[in-house]
Amino acid sequence: IEGLSEIVAQPSVSSTGEGVSKCCELIVKKMKAIGMDVQTYPIEPHSVIIGKIGADPSKKTVLIYAHYDVQPQGDLTQWRTPPFEPTIIEGVMYGRGTADNKGPLMAHLNAIEFWLKEYGELPVNIKTIFEGSEESNSEGLPEFLCSHKELLKADMVYFSDGSKNHNDQPIIALGVKGMLYVELVLTTMTRNVHSQYAPVLPSAAWQMVQLLNKLKTEDGTVHIPGFYDDVVQPTEIEKAIYDKLPDVRENLFRSYGAYPIYPADKGYYIQLNGTPSFNISGISSGYTGNGTATVLTSKAIAKIDMRLVAAQDGNKILDNLKQYIKKLGYDNVEVICHGITEPAKTPVDTPYLLPVEKATRNVFGPYMVYPNRPSTAPDYLWTNILGLPTIQVRWCDATSDNHAPNEHLTLSNYIKGTELTATVLKEISEM
């Protein structure tokens, strides 16, 4: 707990660079202290830390991934405690990065240290890769992996990044959605003017609203040409797994004060995990301050994230989006791509699923298996570039508030997360 508190207290905001190098140094120091061979690779924008321990050819080799960078702190007035002053309240540690992803990172190191202290050796060979740019689309990491495949040679990849479901059960995930993130900048005039001219001059705000309604209609259909062409539907085995999952909808809706929007003809989990999405992450135009101002807006900005499922090609969709906007007559729109992450998937019949399931059951009890999960992580780096089966176990709090004010991690989950990694290593060694 003290070690986690120490690295949470060290800012490591990848988007601004704040404290990232110092956090890297702190983690390297901790890794060396438990006996790992450690090498730092100064790739742009932030360093990758590679750790190794064990080289027994008769043992399996597990590559453990985590990231040490965090999201910006956001609105400080919304935090109950300072984000980089980790505070424990009633068994819960509050602070930026507690759950995403410094808690799991430290749990992995704790598990390695446990095996070495208790038994003098690990049941498997371990390689670790900790990056400092996950929250910035893992920039620079694909190129690093392509040129260091031998260094990272392993049998499988294991990591923990994410939360339990809303029934407080850990989630074992074998795949993730990809993401295409774009910014649409629509300009109608050189500057804002008095709204008295609304009858005769164009409004950027209204044009943006109209454009967005053409890209995705009220029934949820995305109208970018070819958007759904390459979608791989869930297999019958995957559908059977989804059908067995518990109903978490009531707890989910209650937690967020929301109501369901998914179509009645699709199951909740297939809609959540197996369907691509088109989301407005942010939209801005004109006057949004206190009080009133009568403004005819000259510029409108919308930030869009599209979550992609297996076989969808972000580059292809980006090209189609640009062409479609032009075809609709919006020559005044600039499309800025802020990043593309490929979807990734490990088949549910991988032999590594059973030992991970057994370990999770022994440590946490009831759990869920997701053939694919709804969020995005750089799993394609391991499945597509390194060609390795990849399994993730999400065990942080269901309401851990990742990316939001008051991010937190229940210490009992942190302790169990440590125990889980230690047990996963044991179960894999006995395959």
Regions inferred by a protein language model and the residue ranges of each:
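An extended, acidic, His-containing surface patch that forms the Zn2+-binding/catalytic region
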Residues: 166-167, 223-299, 307-320, 328, ...
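Active-site metal-coordination/substrate-binding segment of hydrolases
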Residues: 59-130, 150, 416
